[in-house]
Amino acid sequence: MNGITRRTCLALSALAPIALGALTSSSRSDASVSSREVIRDRYFPNLVLTTHEGRKVRFYDDLIKDKIVTLNFFYTQCEDGRCPLATANLVRVQKLLKDRVGRDIFMYSFTLTPEHDTPAVLKRYAKAYGVGPGWTFLTGEPGDMERLRRKLGFAWANPIRDARKASHTGTLRYGNEPLQLWSACPAMSKPEWIVESMSWLEGPNERRAS
């Protein structure tokens, strides 16, 4: 973990396909369609998901619209140990952000194995790691979770690598939906660097206020 630096976070930001989508959409000839609408339609399917507390939510309308968010994929039966380490690291991020999580920053973790990770399983997992308010674990129909994974850019061109669930658990994506600012970094980056990187998602007024 110590070898993952802030420079790595910033380098990965250039690979974030959602951020690149903003650049692509700006060249569209249809001026009546905003870049925000283009990004929403292209990357944010409004799928119905279920939280670890058993509540039905829509991905765009309820989870990310008008919010600053973090997004990552995981599964509770992670074979190689990456998910427990990443979850524990993100718990430290949540503690650094304090009461901002659930107020103006929202954390979301999506399961890669919805057939096993029911809301009850996710609730036990969150409790075991001491996850606080404002961080939601989500499941859904297998086809919907797969579609969401690909739309959000948690995918590899190599089909063999893409088929390995563990290859999708190492990245944390974060963004400011209304400002169309999106980036990514390794989920095992130092918590302080993740928080610092996320601060640049905010407008100057919010940065001064925090």
List the model feature ranges, each with a label.
Residues 124-169:
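Short, internal strand/loop/helix patches
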Residues 62-83:
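Short active-site neighborhood of thiol/selenol oxidoreductases, capturing the structured segment around
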Residues 161-210:
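Thiol-/selenol-based redox modules, centered on thioredoxin-like
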Residues 104-117, 134-143:
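Thiol-based oxidoreductase modules, predominantly thioredoxin-like and allied folds used
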Residues 19-46:
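N-proximal helix/coil linker or "cap" segments that precede and/or mark the start of modular domains
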Residues 86-108:
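Conserved helix-turn-beta segment immediately C-terminal to the redox Cys motif
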Residues 1-16:
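N-terminal secretory signal peptides and thylakoid transit peptides that target proteins
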Residues 48-68:
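A short beta-strand-turn-helix
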